[in-house]
């Protein structure tokens, strides 16, 4: 069996008297799409900060290759709506040394050519998300972490986004770790789903989320109403 790209072993993190995550264990498999879901305050942000090395666990162990290259797209990406800079210039600022060679490969499946000269402020939600994806992979990471990437997208744009994610992981052999509240989309498009509420409530593959299953009941108890959907192909 191939070694997981990240492994949490009985990890707890304490901030003062608060314990946002307690005894959390899970693995992220290479080249999979793993999605972490949970209510507000469940500890999802703490998990990401631990993955990025911004926090250290109070207890437990996180096994991660120190050479692992990670691309991260936070929930609030930090671009102002009136940013007077073109898409090409923005990406060039991110990775000037290898932009030209890498962006050609990225452009072959993200298709930024027709928007490269547009200002960031003029982009639609779907177009902006393409730029965000390009930002996360322009330096060819082993893993990308996406925090709530679907929030401002309509249903059509969400599906286009997942199609791009699948192309990215297949063409560049990238592992994807995502945080989302959209259970329906998660079920259709993830290889593994982890439900967090301070601890791991349930985890598994989407086809295990069947009516009255332990997985489904755990999700329902947190306000995620489930019914069976076919796993993505």
From Swiss-Prot:
Membrane-topology annotation of the record: Peripheral membrane protein
EC class name: translocase
GO biological process: response to zinc ion
Main location: membrane
Residues annotated to bind ATP: 38-45
Pfam families (UniProt xref): ABC_tran
EC number(s) recorded for this UniProt protein: 7.2.2.20
Record flagged with keyword NADP: no
Any Gene Ontology CC annotation: plasma membrane
Keyword Ion transport: yes
Subcellular location(s) of the protein: Cell inner membrane
Chemical reaction(s) catalysed: Zn(2+)(out) + ATP(in) + H2O(in) = Zn(2+)(in) + ADP(in) + phosphate(in) + H(+)(in)
Boundaries of every ABC transporter domain copy: 6-222
Keyword line: ATP-binding, Cell inner membrane, Cell membrane, Ion transport, Membrane, Nucleotide-binding, Translocase, Transport, Zinc, Zinc transport
A GO term for molecular function: ATP hydrolysis activity
Summary of subunit composition and partner proteins: The complex is composed of two ATP-binding proteins (ZnuC), two transmembrane proteins (ZnuB) and a solute-binding protein (ZnuA).
Its job: Part of the ABC transporter complex ZnuABC involved in zinc import. Responsible for energy coupling to the transport system.
Protein family: Belongs to the ABC transporter superfamily. Zinc importer (TC 3.A.1.15.5) family.
Protein name: Zinc import ATP-binding protein ZnuC
The organism of origin for this protein: Rickettsia felis (strain ATCC VR-1525 / URRWXCal2) (Rickettsia azadi)
Name of the gene this protein is made from: znuC
């Amino acid at each position: 069996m191939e070694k997981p790209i990240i492994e949490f072993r009985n990890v707890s993190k304490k901030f003062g008297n608060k314990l946002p995550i307690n005894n959390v264990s899970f693995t992220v498999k290479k080249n999979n799409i793993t999605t972490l879901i949970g209510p507000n305050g469940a500890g999802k942000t703490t998990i990401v900060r631990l993955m990025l090395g911004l926090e250290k666990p109070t207890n437990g162990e996180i096994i991660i290759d120190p050479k692992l290259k990670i691309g991260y797209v936070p929930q609030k990406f930090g671009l102002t709506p009136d940013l007077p800079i073109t898409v090409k210039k923005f990406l060039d600022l991110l990775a000037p040394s290898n932009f030209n060679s890498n962006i050609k490969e990225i452009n072959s499946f993200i298709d930024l050519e027709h928007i490269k000269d547009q200002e960031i402020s003029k982009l639609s939600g779907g177009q902006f998300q393409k730029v965000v994806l390009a930002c996360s992979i322009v330096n060819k990471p082993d893993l990308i972490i996406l925090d709530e990437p679907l929030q401002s997208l309509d249903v059509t744009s969400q599906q286009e986004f997942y199609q791009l994610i699948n192309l990215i992981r297949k063409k560049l052999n990238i592992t994807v770790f995502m945080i989302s509240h959209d259970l329906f989309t998660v079920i259709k498009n993830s290889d593994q789903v982890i439900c967090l509420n301070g601890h791991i409530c349930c985890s598994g593959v989407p086809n295990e989320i069947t009516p009255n299953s332990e997985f489904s009941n755990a999700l329902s108890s947190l306000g995620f109403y489930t019914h069976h959907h076919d796993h993505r192909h």
